[in-house]
Amino acid sequence: MSVYGLQRLYIAGAHADATSGKTFDTFDPATGELLARVQQASADDVDRAVASAREGQREWAAMTAMQRSRILRRAVELLRERNDALAELEMRDTGKPIAETRAVDIVTGADVIEYYAGLATAIEGLQVPLRPESFVYTRREPLGVCAGIGAWNYPIQIACWKSAPALAAGNAMIFKPSEVTPLSALKLAEIYTEAGVPAGVFNVVQGDGSVGALLSAHPGIAKVSFTGGVETGKKVMSLAGASSLKEVTMELGGKSPLIVFDDADLDRAADIAVTANFFSAGQVCTNGTRVFVQQAVKDAFVERVLARVARIRVGKPSDPDTNFGPLASAAQLDKVLGYIDSGKAEGAKLLAGGARLVNDHFASGQYVAPTVFGDCRDDMRIVREEIFGPVMSILPFETEDEAIARANATDYGLAAGVVTENLSRAHRAIHRLEAGICWINTWGESPAEMPVGGYKQSGVGRENGITTLEHYTRIKSVQVELGRYQPVF
């Protein structure tokens, strides 16, 4: 018997049965309890979703921008009214502490919808004079039907981040949440419908990567926005291009450097490093997992980090005092433990954690102790590859040039940060770091106003910020001739 029963698709403004005959299960990562059995979409279901999205998008785009803005603002109100209930659902599905899901997941999703609701009326074109008798004007028009493919670490936040700019610009979206955390996207769909979004404008299709592939290759979809791993992102991008040259936004993985210089406030630096590695049990794409520390302050910094790690409160996600929960799935647990074993085998010095937690109530959950490795080398797997778990690697350095060169020696380029009291060095270093999201003397905040996305293999395009609206519209140029037409022949 599951907690939430059978979960269906959401198409054309209502829950709908899938036609595949297939289902998959989703579990509470803290207890192993069966949360729900979820119907998997078929190719026919994806076709249904696209057809309803096309119909709904025509109605949605025909509304005035102010009408769309008001409806999106109503969705924001409903999200905030139901914050606690949605936070509990997200806690059960992801394993995150309730204190975190109440304060972050729904709140930041609602903030982004509110932000784009305010910008919906600001989508405008340009007027370009050519000569006294002729001018050009441009229109920013919606793309049509967009697909959003989410990751399992921030299910409802990602659904909001992808749908908000799409809907604000007059598009429809078909969203596929991760099969690991599939529940909250359905609640967002219900809220959009209740707020007045026309049927079909936000559909949810459930399933594994095969459903994502169907969306990526579908000729009726104009854009795909994907959040997930690099290799899967490359497959999505390939399908999107080969099928119909779709627009793409890719928010992919990272192996982000945090550089602590010898003039840094070490207490502040330790606070930043611990947050940048252990928030959400390390399951954050922007985590600063490569911590470069200037040699002169390394020992003092490590001492402060370990003191803070010892204060982390690992526990049941439902306990308001817990600030560190389980990993999201058994597969992720095995992956993280494999990397920890690799770090030990390659000679990294284990300073904290390094094992699965199995005592008391941890036994049935996917818990790994917050882990810190010292004296790491750049060639170690734990330093080179994205782990997506609570594993910090500390790497000593001598000079600024050395730190920058080593920080940039990666195929990733999602995030980076520096901690220093020297303003000139802070900006100089940040300008040399090859990353799309950077922080000085802080880490992790990604407000609605801030464009986020990666360099190199960490992504294409941006989410959030004004610039993202450009990625959900296309420009139509119109020349107007007021004078006599001059024939060529």
UniProtKB/Swiss-Prot annotation:
The active site is at 162 (charge relay system), 251 (proton acceptor), 285 (nucleophile), 463 (charge relay system). Its EC number is 1.2.1.8. NAD(+) binds at residues 150-152, 176-179, 229-232, 253, 285, 386. Keywords: Metal-binding, NAD, NADP, Oxidation, Oxidoreductase, Potassium. Binds 2 potassium ions per subunit. One of its GO terms (molecular function) is betaine-aldehyde dehydrogenase (NAD+) activity. GO terms for biological process: glycine betaine biosynthetic process from choline. Pfam families: Aldedh. K(+) 1 binds at residues 26, 93, 180. Its cofactor is K(+). InterPro entries: Ald_DH/histidinol_DH, Ald_DH_C, Ald_DH_CS_CYS, Ald_DH_CS_GLU, Ald_DH_N, Aldehyde_DH_dom, BADH. It catalyses: betaine aldehyde + NAD(+) + H2O = glycine betaine + NADH + 2 H(+). HAMAP family: BADH (MF_00804). NCBIfam families: BADH, PRK13252.1. Dimer of dimers. This is Betaine aldehyde dehydrogenase. It comes from Burkholderia pseudomallei (strain K96243).
